[in-house]
Design a protein with these regions (language model features):
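Bacterial Sec-dependent signal peptides at the C-terminal "C-region" and cleavage site
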Residues: 2-19
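N-terminal soluble domains immediately following signal/targeting peptides that reside
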Residues: 17-148
Length: 148
């Protein structure tokens, strides 16, 4: 069910028409060979620009780091490395990387991107790690959630 939800919401981010929902899709892929995880955040560019003035890398990175985080099993927040951002049609794709030598199991996720701006904000986080896929769904006011 969560996979279909993510697919459906992802389709919304692919269209060029005005969007009826405020949605952020985040994909986290653990790369065991490097002991790190690649993070791709897809967000409607106009929604993101309404929150981050100027659109500089430093402004975008500061906002993302304040609204999205990963913490290890002990609660230590993992440093998000900025790899850049680019537009793909109406969508802004933000690329990050995080050291995750122990994998993503039990990692705690905070996803509050744009929740401060839009009451109907829905954030989907899809993580691929250790031969499995897990999907977390966040709405405004949700607490941090752990990956299984």
């Amino acid at each position: 069910m969560h996979g279909l939800l993510a697919l459906g919401l992802g389709s919304l981010l692919a269209g060029a028409a005005p969007h009826p929902m405020h949605t952020v899709i985040t994909e986290i892929t653990h790369e065991a060979a490097t002991g790190s995880a690649a993070i791709r955040i897809r967000v409607f560019a106009d929604d993101f620009q309404a929150v981050v003035a100027g659109g500089s890398d430093s402004a975008m990175a500061a906002y993302v780091r304040g609204a999205f985080s990963l913490a290890d099993r002990s609660g230590r927040v993992l440093a998000l490395g900025w790899e850049g951002a680019a537009t793909d049609g109406d969508v802004l794709v933000i690329r990050l990387r995080v050291a995750a030598p122990a994998g993503l199991s039990a990692v705690r996720v905070k996803s509050e991107l744009l929740s401060d701006r839009f009451e109907d904000q829905v954030n989907v986080v899809r993580a691929v790690y250790g031969g499995r896929t897990a999907t977390l769904l966040f709405v405004r006011g949700d607490p941090v959630k752990a990956l299984p």
